């Protein structure tokens, strides 16, 4: 099945149910590919092709392992695709906990054989924040994702706090995965959340499927 067809099937199911900095050189999460002109996460200006799939204009694609030393914010209108087998490691020894804030769309396309792994370097609960999806985030697919050691408390400089996505006071950690667009769609399929300090999932809106 083509990537686009698989995503469409997962999101159709959701509708039916409820009618950074990068330390390693192999991928820069702030560019749409390895030589992407410092576009600050704005996505590609042309169709992107990788060994796995072809992605539409406006895409960010992470094809290889990466280490985040600061938060990543995906703007409205931009889609981030994380390909099978990719490991994203969040550094814990930072002043502002790492968060993946999705104001656009996110597709973690792991498989049973090659899951997407999102973890931390020291492997302790609350090492990093979580995946926080904004009020305009239309689609999120987490397919075969192993997510661990999230739940850190945000600071006033955290993008989740500045965008008022979860906490308006600094009184506790963020969830490992939070979705809050009442008109959005999300799928969490064959995922493993573990060693998380706060809530594993938290939903304040949207149409979703979890299985």
PLM feature segments, named:
Residues 18-21:
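C-terminal motif of bacterial Sec signal peptides marking the signal peptidase cleavage site
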Residues 12-16:
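Hydrophobic helical h-region of N-terminal Sec-dependent signal peptides
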Residues 23-211:
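Beta-strand/loop edge motif enriched in small/polar residues
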Residues 8-11, 30-31:
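A ubiquitous, low-specificity "background" feature that marks scattered single residues
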Residues 1-9:
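Bacterial N-terminal signal peptides that target proteins for export
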């Amino acid at each position: 099945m083509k990537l686009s067809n698989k995503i469409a099937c997962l999101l159709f199911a959701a509708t039916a149910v409820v009618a950074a900095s990068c330390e390693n050189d192999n991928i820069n999460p702030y560019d749409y590919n390895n030589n992407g002109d410092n576009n600050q996460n704005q996505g590609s200006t042309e169709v992107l092709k990788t060994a796995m799939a072809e992605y539409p204009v406006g895409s960010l694609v992470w094809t290889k392992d990466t280490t985040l030393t600061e938060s990543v914010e995906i703007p409205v209108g931009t889609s981030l695709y994380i390909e099978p087998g990719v490991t994203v490691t969040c550094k814990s020894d930072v002043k502002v906990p790492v968060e993946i804030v999705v104001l656009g769309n996110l597709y973690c396309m792991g498989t049973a054989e090659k899951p997407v792994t999102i973890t931390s370097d020291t492997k302790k609960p609350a090492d990093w924040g979580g995946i926080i999806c904004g009020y305009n985030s239309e689609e999120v697919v987490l397919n075969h994702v192993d997510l661990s050691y999230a739940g850190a408390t945000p600071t006033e400089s955290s993008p989740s706090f500045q965008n008022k996505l979860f906490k308006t006071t600094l009184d506790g950690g963020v969830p490992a995965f939070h979705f809050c667009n009442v008109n959005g769609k999300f799928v969490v399929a064959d995922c493993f959340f573990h060693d998380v300090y706060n809530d594993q999932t938290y939903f304040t809106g949207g149409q979703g499927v979890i299985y």
